[in-house]
């Protein structure tokens, strides 16, 4: 195992066994699930499914399984928001191990495209988040230097990445006492794609001060100071970026490239020769087709890229030449994050019923966009090799897989050696009781149920359309119900405030369309009402119904009412499954003498800018002067960075938007520094 050196101050640097630090022991069905899953993998099972009901502690169960298996693990989530939540949970559960985060580093991403119908070329446009880029480099570095690694990732994990062999081969090892001149070090850093910048010291740069060279690696929060005595490295120091204070002295360190697509000089020369040869063939192809515009276009664009590669070792869109930068052939699977893992790693696919379809859909969407670029002379055909993995390639690269879901899909069930159920919750809560009522007078019945709900309990109502939700909210208000409406345009600040208001009793009812996407796990909710439950479709599928019913499973008094004029197949299956689980839970509690208890979850101050409970004063009244606006923006920027550091990307983006509004209102204020994640969608 290679030394990691002093570059990871935010997590331990030494290999340790994966060890869970939890304030509680496994309970409910967790002990049996852990034992069964571990035994399955140890006996040779390649694929298993953990079917865990809402609130059963699936993440904790997975953590205890990892502790038993002691293997590097990839945890896949279907969006950045869920990945961030899992990342925080695993970091808390494994404080002494390398828990890493790997998602798309784009705040904004417009892929390169060409629209033939209108002869419109759309150049690639993007904004990269530096903190997420740092975390991506931290993830790949950890995978190549230690074993106790858990990487939480989105579907970015199946998109092209640089050759891990190049990334590892080019790593620069420095030791105190090495015979190496300052000039040799500077040359080596340039080859690793680090840039010299003596003024603006940021990630991926180095600066020189006399006999001292300071390097700010892509993957750490501290810099490395290299002090020379003549042509010998005298000392290696870890230093604070802000004040320059020495944190520690280190005997050695390992500097990995600043770009995942970095390549050794000899490989780059070969790549350029291959690109030049392919370019000649492509020009001939277009000329034979009589398409002189495309011939000129591909020649100009590719020649410029070649010149940049020759001068700097890098070019914009270098990923489109990735097949030339590695030892693979055209058509072979691209190198991805999965190739940085050692053999025999474990893959955990969270919310597999959503993540599996997402993985399956990535390749075709990417291919169709690139066809137009290649056929019209904007890219060489090898651009096709810069792509996500096909699903069968993903399967081939993952050895042992654990699917995790409350509602596994057919794929998981068909491909798993066993499906392990986790039905009994650690809190011993049972699934809610279910009633089906006619849809004809659903609103009148709903109002009666709301009025019968105790003051300390809450109600969630889900409708099919935005218009229905708005009309219902207005009707309930006129009937004297304290109600609010949550929809897809409700931003993070409003969502936090709405949920808090519901929990505090400021409102009793929350109406929404797809309550699943809101992540509403509220212990006070004792009634979930599903209107028009017999309208087949995504929002009323078996999976969605089971998930929505689970929103009432955190309260002892939890119940669900489905309004329908007929019982659809989806309804029947969802009701049967929920009642089956409820019976198992009740039998377990009776046999072991357990009393269900409502989950206790304190209602904390949201302290979010723009909220009524903003105790930091960020949510000031609208400023009247430029000075007031500048003061408010300064506070908002501090909160924005805190949110980004905590991986609360949607919140950070909403604060960023508030800053932009203030700057537009008060002319003359400088533009905000970009670098805060936008709400998630991968590509």
Swiss-Prot record:
Entry keyword Oxidoreductase: no
InterPro entries found in the cross-reference section: Helicase/UvrB_N (IPR006935), Helicase_ATP-bd (IPR014001), Helicase_C-like (IPR001650), P-loop_NTPase (IPR027417), UVR_dom (IPR001943), UVR_dom_sf (IPR036876), UvrB (IPR004807), UvrB_inter (IPR041471)
This protein's GO CC annotations: cytoplasm; excinuclease repair complex
Bias kind Polar residues: ranges: 604-615
Residue numbers binding ATP: 52-59
Pfam families: Helicase_C, ResIII, UVR, UvrB, UvrB_inter
Residue ranges of every copy of the Helicase C-terminal domain listed in the record: 442-604
PROSITE patterns for this protein: HELICASE_ATP_BIND_1 (PS51192), HELICASE_CTER (PS51194), UVR (PS50151)
Biased segments, Basic and acidic residues type: 587-603
Keyword line: ATP-binding, Cytoplasm, DNA damage, DNA excision, DNA repair, Excision nuclease, Nucleotide-binding, SOS response
Biological process according to GO: nucleotide-excision repair; SOS response
Recorded superkingdom: Archaea
CDD domains (UniProt xref): DEXHc_UvrB, SF2_C_UvrB
GO molecular function annotations of the record: ATP binding; ATP hydrolysis activity; DNA binding; excinuclease ABC activity
UniProt keyword annotation of Transferase present: no
Motif Beta-hairpin: positions: 105-128
Domain UVR stretches: 630-665
Entry function: The UvrABC repair system catalyzes the recognition and processing of DNA lesions. A damage recognition complex composed of 2 UvrA and 2 UvrB subunits scans DNA for abnormalities. Upon binding of the UvrA(2)B(2) complex to a putative damaged site, the DNA wraps around one UvrB monomer. DNA wrap is dependent on ATP binding by UvrB and probably causes local melting of the DNA helix, facilitating insertion of UvrB beta-hairpin between the DNA strands. Then UvrB probes one DNA strand for the presence of a lesion.
UniProt note: domains: The beta-hairpin motif is involved in DNA binding.
PANTHER family found in the cross-reference section: UVRABC SYSTEM PROTEIN B
Family: Belongs to the UvrB family.
Name of the protein: UvrABC system protein B
Species of origin: Natronomonas pharaonis (strain ATCC 35678 / DSM 2160 / CIP 103997 / JCM 8858 / NBRC 14720 / NCIMB 2260 / Gabara) (Halobacterium pharaonis)
């Amino acid at each position: 195992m290679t030394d990691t050196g002093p570059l990871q101050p935010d997590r331990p640097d030494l290999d340790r066994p994966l060890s869970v630090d939890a304030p509680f022991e496994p309970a409910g069905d967790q002990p049996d699930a852990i034992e069964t899953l571990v035994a399955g993998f140890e006996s040779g099972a390649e694929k298993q499914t953990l079917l865990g009901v809402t609130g059963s502690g699936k993440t904790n169960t997975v953590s205890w399984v990892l502790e038993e298996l002691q293997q590097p693990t990839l945890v896949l989530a279907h969006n950045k928001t869920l990945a961030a939540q899992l990342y925080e949970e695993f970091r808390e559960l494994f404080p002494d191990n390398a828990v890493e985060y790997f998602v798309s580093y784009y705040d904004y991403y417009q892929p390169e495209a060409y629209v033939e119908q209108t002869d419109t070329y759309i150049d690639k446009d993007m904004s990269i988040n530096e903190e997420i880029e740092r975390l991506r480099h931290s993830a790949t570095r950890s995978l190549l230097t230690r074993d106790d690694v858990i990487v939480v990732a989105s579907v970015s994990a199946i998109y092209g990445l640089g050759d891990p062999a190049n990334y590892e081969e080019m790593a620069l090892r420095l030791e105190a006492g090495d015979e190496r001149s300052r000039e040799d070090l500077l040359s080596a850093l340039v080859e690793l794609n680090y840039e010299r910048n003596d003024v603006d010291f940021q990630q991926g740069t180095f600066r020189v001060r006399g006999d001292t060279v300071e390097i700010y690696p892509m993957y750490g929060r501290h810099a490395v100071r290299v002090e020379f005595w003549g042509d010998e490295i005298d000392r290696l120091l870890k230093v604070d970026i802000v004040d320059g204070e020495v944190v520690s002295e280190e005997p050695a360190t390992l500097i990995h490239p600043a770009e995942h697509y970095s390549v050794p000089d000899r490989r780059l020369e070969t790549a350029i020769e291959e690109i030049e040869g392919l370019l000649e063939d492509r020009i001939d192809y277009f000329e034979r087709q009589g398409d002189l515009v495309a011939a000129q276009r591909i020649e100009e664009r590719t020649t410029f890229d070649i010149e940049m590669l020759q001068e700097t070792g890098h070019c914009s869109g270098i990923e489109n030449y990735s097949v030339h930068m590695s030892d693979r052939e055209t058509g072979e699977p691209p190198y991805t994050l999965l190739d940085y893992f050692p053999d025999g790693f474990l893959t955990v696919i969270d919310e597999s019923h959503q993540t599996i379809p997402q993985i399956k859909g990535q390749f075709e969407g990417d291919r169709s966009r690139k066809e137009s670029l290649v056929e019209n002379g904007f890219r060489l055909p090898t651009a096709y090799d810069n792509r996500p993995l096909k699903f069968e390639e993903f399967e081939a690269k993952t050895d042992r897989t654990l699917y995790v879901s409350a509602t596994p899909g057919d794929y998981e069930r068909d491909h798993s050696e066993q499906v392990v159920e986790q039905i009994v919750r650690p809190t011993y809560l049972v699934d809610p009781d279910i009633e089906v009522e006619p849809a004809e007078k659903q609103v009148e019945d709903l109002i009666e149920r709301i009025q019968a709900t105790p003051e300390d309990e809450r109600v969630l109502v889900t409708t099919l359309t935005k218009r229905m939700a708005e009309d219902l909210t207005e009707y309930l208000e006129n009937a004297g119900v304290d109600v609010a409406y949550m929809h897809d345009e409700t931003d993070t600040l409003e969502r936090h405030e709405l949920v808090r208001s519901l929990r505090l009793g400021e409102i009793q009812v929350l109406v929404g369309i797809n309550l699943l996407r809101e992540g509403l796990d509220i212990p006070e909710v004792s009634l979930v009402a599903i209107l028009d439950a017999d309208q087949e479709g995504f929002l009323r599928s078996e999976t969605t119904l089971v998930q929505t019913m689970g929103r009432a499973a955190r309260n002892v008094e939890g119940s669900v009412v489905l309004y329908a004029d007929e019982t659809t197949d989806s309804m029947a299956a969802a009701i049967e499954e929920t009642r089956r689980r409820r019976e198992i839970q009740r039998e377990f509690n009776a046999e072991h003498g357990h009393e269900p208890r409502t989950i206790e979850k304190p209602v904390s101050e949201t302290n979010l800018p723009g909220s009524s409970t903003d105790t930091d004063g960020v949510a000031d009244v609208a400023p009247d002067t430029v000075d007031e606006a500048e003061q408010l923006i300064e506070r908002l920027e501090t909160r924005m960075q805190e949110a980004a550091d905590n991986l609360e990307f949607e919140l950070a983006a909403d604060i960023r938007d508030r800053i932009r509004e203030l700057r537009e209102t008060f002319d003359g204020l400088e533009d905000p520094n970009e670098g805060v994640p936008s709400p998630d969608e991968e590509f």
